[in-house]
Amino acid sequence: MIYLDYSANTPADPEVLDAYVAAERRYIANPNSTHIAGQEARAEMERATQSIAQRLGVQPAEIIYTSGASEANNLAIKGIAHASRHIGKHIISTQLEHSSVGASLTALQQHGYEIDLLDINRDGRV
């Protein structure tokens, strides 16, 4: 099978998958739990966050973990819209966006934002 929809799902690199499985086996507790296993999971999560932040050149507090793409899209779109509302409340997107993007834009529209959705031609071009 040739899978071409990497926008929706992307196979994990085997090395990444191995690291994930090892961490999943070792750190079984909720990192917000107060018991020892939770504290160990929290320490590993903080170590990983520090490593990611260093590689990205940001502060660890700037990294936000979400449960998936829909939550991340919602947080990013509404967050930047509200943070930039003093500049303007006009957002341009496309008809091709993920449904979570559309839902966020609809919510913003109900709060006074002007939303324009551009059409895509048969070649996928705006």
Identify the residue ranges that each predicted region occupies.
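Pyridoxal 5′-phosphate
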Residues: 1-126
